[in-house]
């Protein structure tokens, strides 16, 4: 049976400032930690990326032509405040006014994120969100943007608080490249959630007319053997690290006893302690019912096995299938069932995980109000032939996830939109330019755009709301 989506559904495309804009030092933009980190550690940089800084009229025209009626955009904090605070860069402000005006001209609703992995270097080198001073700087930056850009009706504070802490302090593939420091992971999560809560409260106190929420990456965690209590425990602990800790902060305003017990166990085994203050919980409590929506980024699920050994994580950044490894002392190790497909980057393709995660939110956090799927898509080594890409695998991936999304809506979840990652091909943080996600192929040499087969399929989807 062909499944469908609601008439008022947003069919969106997602981007991010640093991954799309290029122009990393143009018109007064301040540096971010990624600039030097990529030069020192990787075989690529974010220059020129998709040159969205200059090409956004082209991309938004394509969006309109292909039925995309929403776009995720992030503001580069260091375009507005080159050092993260203090003097405003007027050219950065002007750019975003022009960008949002073009969105509305093209009838593509902008969903705007304040922070997408790109803290200004001056603040990042001073501890990023481990430094509580940067909570204040973020709230000041948010306050400026809320006041300056009334044309924005949908705001999100952060993109993927979980993967920021993981990337910076656990896997070590984000600057500053620290590995296996679980205390820093949790402290980063916590301080960013406090920053989120304070920005949301400020937005509501000021009486702005739009909506505000947060985008969380929520990979669903399963026990490898559901009959084995040790595997079940491993999945629970892994879920606390990546999902439950930040969801509790978002919607409970505190950490449940189960969550705190799990965190304390992990830190007892791995070392470290957290700085959790009364004023932090006052901020979380004040904002827990003020979020207008939750953005869910979902790409994959994980299966966990019991593990008794030392932490070791190997990141598959080059698309060499089977080269990744993930095991955490006192938590567990990832091992996927052999019958479940995965990408060349070892990302497990499991649409049911999206359904399960949505229904988990509905059950455990009933004050969620509404959900947007703010990222979902297939990274692939696209083959450019005849001025297009015949990306049937991407179409199949998106179709399967939209079908379970339709099921979740039928089962009572309030899901209002879907943003494919990504609108056009962009640069990937730890994979460079080989891993493509876009509806539109970007020739990174010429910056020409070419619709892929998936773009034509997505247009039909948006026109009919039928998942075919």
From Swiss-Prot:
What UniProt keywords are attached to this protein's entry? Glycosidase, Hydrolase
- Record's catalysed reaction(s): a 6-phospho-beta-D-galactoside + H2O = D-galactose 6-phosphate + an alcohol
Q: What class of enzyme is it?
A: hydrolase
Quick one: a GO cellular component term? cytosol
Q: Does the keyword Heme apply?
A: no
> Hydrolase as a keyword?
yes
What Pfam families does this protein's entry cite? Glyco_hydro_1 (PF00232)
Q: For D-galactose 6-phosphate, which residues are the binding ones? A: 19, 116, 159-160, 297, 428-429, 435, 437
| Record InterPro entries | 6P-beta-galactosidase (IPR005928), Glyco_hydro_1 (IPR001360), Glyco_hydro_1_AS (IPR018120), Glyco_hydro_1_N_CS (IPR033132), Glycoside_hydrolase_SF (IPR017853)
Can you tell me which residues form the catalytic site? Answer: 160 (proton donor), 375 (nucleophile)
A GO biological process held by the record? lactose catabolic process via tagatose-6-phosphate
Identify the metabolic or biological route this protein is part of. Answer: Carbohydrate metabolism; lactose degradation; D-galactose 6-phosphate and beta-D-glucose from lactose 6-phosphate: step 1/1
Which Gene Ontology MF annotations are present? Answer: 6-phospho-beta-galactosidase activity; beta-glucosidase activity
The Enzyme Commission number assigned here is: 3.2.1.85
Transmembrane residue ranges: none
| UniProt record similarity statement | Belongs to the glycosyl hydrolase 1 family.
What the entry lists under NCBIfam families is as follows: lacG (TIGR01233), PRK13511.1 (NF010036)
Q: What is this protein called?
A: 6-phospho-beta-galactosidase
Which organism is the protein's source? Streptococcus gordonii (strain Challis / ATCC 35105 / BCRC 15272 / CH1 / DL1 / V288)
